[in-house]
């Protein structure tokens, strides 16, 4: 394989928002980890790491209309039920923005703790992702704004609720306590589902769920400030080198044959059209490195060493050959894009046949303002420009974003009061190395809406499978989560016995 075509999906909104401007412009905002693999398929030739059966369920296309509309088939995965008994606990993972097999393979925590509770494990796929395509195919589902109009978080939550209700009835287990799980976007869904449908599940673990990353609830520069701080804490000289590299890229790109030189220097499969393509490619690498800065080797996105930012900065700081700045930047980025050394050239082009589902979501409901500050960020400075953002969404999908809809639907500036008044049994776990933690719940809301925060945690690291290299703080974090879930289930059965003894 001579091209790393899977990189295409890592470059956030590149096809939507590519721009040569670096200030007061709409730049490609970052995606969640799952978005990077929204269109990728797991390796079907290797067996899944956990035992489960693939099943399908007929869902209504529109849960909020009584008009006759077609149904679609939703995929879900059911774990081994050897230890599960009727009315026993159900652990339900709310599907992210991608193929559900991939999330099941990378959420070892749920599989590992399920036997301790004799729980049945369910992973449900999100509509419009993986095999759960309305209208029978992705091409037809993604055809236009009309065919994608049912592609919303509200419809997805209703899918999960209907599926769970039907499943419990078919299993004759209407009294089974359900615990919701999710990381990143799925963590947001788990928290929102617990709020919106509290009768369906007794609690939710929402890992790395940035439910506050809307409107101006948190400063728009928060995400890139955290990424920058991750690099600064590792090496100030590395941080400074990356910050200087953007001007170096632009200067070389403007000279005669400069784009050709850059294309050769960064081993690109095709000649650059502009320097912004390369800047976006590098920005994506730095952002995702911050998300997956795990304390153990991982292959969650790409094969990476433990603490990959440390390794990137080693290459940028310690070049024995005395290479120039951009050569060192390429060497650092290669830790992310080519740690195995198997890639001969890099393809920066996005999918020519269409846009990913997450781009649609970001152009409709999931509007998360992002900017990069001159003072604290190592990235090119820019301001969030909603007008430009909206124009690109109209151009791409013929839709106008609704930046206030998610806060209207699930709680905005008063989300803490809403959680305290109406919420219960929700764990918000965040690691402060994760750039999405800036939009997360970082303090306890009430006795039962709990924030578990780790200083050295990255993006939903707690949901990954356990490893001998796990640091003590990660072991203790997972133990705390298990104890809280035990309490929810114990209280549920206690109340149920009390109710039936009356």
PLM regions with names:
Residues 199-317:
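A catalytic-pocket lid/entrance helix-loop region that shapes and gates access to the active site
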Residues 180-182, 207, 429:
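Short beta-strand immediately N-terminal to the catalytic nucleophile in serine-hydrolase-like folds
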Residues 172-185:
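Alpha/beta-hydrolase fold nucleophile elbow
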Residues 68-72, 149-161, 474-483:
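Phosphate/oxyanion-binding active-site loops and adjacent basic polyanion-contact surfaces
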Residues 2-120, 131, 433, 483-502:
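Catalytic-loop region of hydrolases
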Residues 182-186, 190, 194, 434:
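Gly/Ala-rich beta-loop-alpha elbow adjacent to hydrolase catalytic centers
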Residues 278-502:
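C-terminal subdomain of alpha/beta-hydrolase-fold enzymes, centered on the catalytic histidine
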Residues 82-83, 88-90, 95-158, 448-466:
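Active-site machinery of serine-nucleophile hydrolases
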